[in-house]
Design a protein with these regions (language model features):
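Short alpha-helical
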Residues: 33, 92-95, 120
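A metal-dependent, Asp-based hydrolase signature
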Residues: 55-85
């Protein structure tokens, strides 16, 4: 018994013209839930401070490294921001999802990587995971 692949109708036959995709949990797998990973990395206060303070880093008003350095200093942690940054370098592309993106593009849909990422993580995803060229629009 074989499992057939779903057929993606041509974009010309659908009112849908574009598909927006997130990274974490959609195009890539991160394993450990984020709150748990942050708690393991620096403790509960660190996890909460990172979640509470992440908005500026996601908006590009502060780098992730600057946020990490500030939180480590404010909490008096004996951790290095550069070591903590490695937590943001954990993700594995989901090959099934990436194939779906290629299939959508082949069927004529515009694909958009619509994800909130800090600059450091975005660069890592592009350089190490190969996101450049996956979607039609990724900015």
């Amino acid at each position: 018994m074989s499992i057939s692949q779903p057929v993606i109708p041509p974009a010309s036959s659908s009112p849908v013209r574009a598909v927006l995709l997130d990274a974490d949990g959609v195009l890539q797998l991160i394993g450990t839930p984020w709150g748990e990973a942050l708690t393991r990395g620096g403790g509960p206060a660190f996890a909460q401070a990172m979640i509470d303070g992440e908005t500026d880093a996601l908006a590009g008003r502060e780098t992730l490294t600057e946020l990490l350095e500030r939180v480590v200093k404010d909490l008096g942690l004996e951790l290095r921001a550069s070591d903590l940054l490695e937590m943001w370098h954990r993700a594995t592309p989901d090959p099934v999802a990436w194939q779906l993106v290629r299939d959508l593009r082949e069927a004529g849909y515009t694909t958009v990587l619509a994800t909130n990422q800090q600059w450091e993580r975005r660069a890592w995803m592009r350089e190490q995971l190969g996101y450049d060229g996956l979607c039609d629009i990724d900015g």
